[in-house]
Amino acid sequence: TGLDVTTQAAVMDLITSLARERQMATLFITHDLALAADHCDRIVVMHAGHAVEAAPARALFTQARHPYTARLLSSTPGEKTRSAQELKPVPGNLPDLRRDDLPGCRFADRCERRSELCVHERPALDPVATHSAACWHPLFGPPARSRGSVRHA
């Protein structure tokens, strides 16, 4: 992120071409969603230390399922953004990150779609699904499963 745009593009192109040439995977950790969109096949969105959505890159940007992902995307400038007024920041504050034992969804206090279920039971991200959101009330697709009923690959 500290690189100028030209150097950043050259480094990312090199990493991408080496990965394809050598048929290897790369793990790219970033806050730069535009960069991830250009160079990643799949994206996992994290919130408060937990994966909340996993999807093919194009699907994530066109049909975000988790409310946090949608808010994150709407708070980031893009090609269609004309002014700062069009950006929608994610409201509220993060939960206490020192407490991983808290029940419920970590985004519940900041979510417009929350219900009592969100506050009391943490949803699971389906590790097998192509596009999955750890959300009881996703914007698209089926709701999450409870943590005890998730199938594993």
Can you name each region flagged by the protein language model?
Residues L3-Q85:
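P-loop NTP-binding/switch modules centered on Walker-like glycine-rich loops
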Residues P56-A153:
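Charged, flexible cofactor/metal-binding loops and thiol motifs
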